[in-house]
């Protein structure tokens, strides 16, 4: 069995990443899924969350808004509504989006789409978490 698998993450706008990994964590609808080479074939819906993948001891991260994953023994394809690398995330904008979404949750009435506001908060939190990986790498000189 191979030690790695290929993967790609695609949005409607672009190919976000095409790489090789030894392992990957993806945010499934019912929790995170761990992917290793030789994984059983699977198609699954993905939720808002952090994607991580590791190659030669280095772990990289991406923020995922929503999507689907096709997992094959030697390849993973993720079709995402939106996906961002840490260096692409505008931290100030993500903080402001989180603040606005939290304020929406404080309102009440028929105009409040509660689930949409919760998703906006979660997405902003994930973006900030992924962005923090870039900050911590810069601090240690990577």
From Swiss-Prot:
Assign the protein's first listed, main location to one coarse class.
membrane
**Tell me, what's a Pfam family for it?**
ATP-synt_DE
This protein's GO cellular component annotations are: plasma membrane; proton-transporting ATP synthase complex
| Lineage top rank: taxon | Bacteria
Q: How does the record classify its membrane topology?
A: Peripheral membrane protein
Mind telling me which Gene3D superfamilies this protein's record contains? ATP synthase delta/epsilon subunit, C-terminal domain, F0F1 ATP synthase delta/epsilon subunit, N-terminal
What's a Gene Ontology MF term here? Answer: ATP binding
The record's subcellular location field reads:
Cell inner membrane
Q: Which UniProt keywords apply?
A: ATP synthesis, Cell inner membrane, Cell membrane, CF(1), Hydrogen ion transport, Ion transport, Membrane, Transport
Q: Does the keyword Ion transport apply?
A: yes
The record describes the protein's role as: Produces ATP from ADP in the presence of a proton gradient across the membrane.
Q: Which family does it belong to?
A: Belongs to the ATPase epsilon chain family.
Known partners and oligomeric status: F-type ATPases have 2 components, CF(1) - the catalytic core - and CF(0) - the membrane proton channel. CF(1) has five subunits: alpha(3), beta(3), gamma(1), delta(1), epsilon(1). CF(0) has three main subunits: a, b and c.
Query: What protein am I looking at?
Result: ATP synthase epsilon chain
- The gene it comes from is atpC
